[in-house]
Amino acid sequence: MQTTMLKAKLHRARVTHSELEYEGSCAIDGSLLDCAGIREYEQIQIYNVNNGERFTTYAIRAADGSGTISVNGAAARLAAVGDIVIICAYVGLNQAELAAYRPNLVYVDENNQITRTSHAIPVQAA
């Protein structure tokens, strides 16, 4: 049996481009992909903090250090330049793999530059 777990998260990234006529996907600064462990063409989920939209696409690599988060194709109707998004990738793990499992969490500033990384989300206080 496999359990689907959060593999990686880019937390509160800012959309820098929205290209309706592009082939599709989401272009992400390559240094962010590397830090999070998200592979080019990997399926990702995008959660738009501004409007509540949640959608699936795949990652493509943008220039390292560029800060680019470009939502392309039909998904461009779901995210505008300046919107804050959470980008997640998931992985299926078997019971043996779960014991050592830790997600890659990447936190960015308003220019999509890495401010910190973590492998755990703090317990939410009531």
From Swiss-Prot:
Q: Which InterPro entries match?
A: Asp_de-COase-like_dom_sf, Asp_decarbox
Q: What is its main location?
A: cytoplasm
Asked if the record carries the keyword Cytoplasm, the reply is: yes
Which EC numbers does the record give?
Answer: 4.1.1.11
Pathway(s) this gene product operates in, as recorded in its UniProt entry: Cofactor biosynthesis; (R)-pantothenate biosynthesis; beta-alanine from L-aspartate: step 1/1
Any GO CC annotation of this UniProt entry? cytosol
Q: Where does substrate bind?
A: T57, G73, A74, A75
State the active site. Answer: S25, Y58
The molecular function terms of the Gene Ontology recorded here are: aspartate 1-decarboxylase activity
A single GO BP: pantothenate biosynthetic process
Q: How is it modified after translation?
A: Is synthesized initially as an inactive proenzyme, which is activated by self-cleavage at a specific serine bond to produce a beta-subunit with a hydroxyl group at its C-terminus and an alpha-subunit with a pyruvoyl group at its N-terminus.
Q: What does the UniProt function comment say about this protein?
A: Catalyzes the pyruvoyl-dependent decarboxylation of aspartate to produce beta-alanine.
Partners and quaternary state? Heterooctamer of four alpha and four beta subunits.
Database matches in PANTHER family: ASPARTATE 1-DECARBOXYLASE
Q: What is this protein called?
A: Aspartate 1-decarboxylase
Gene this protein is translated from: panD
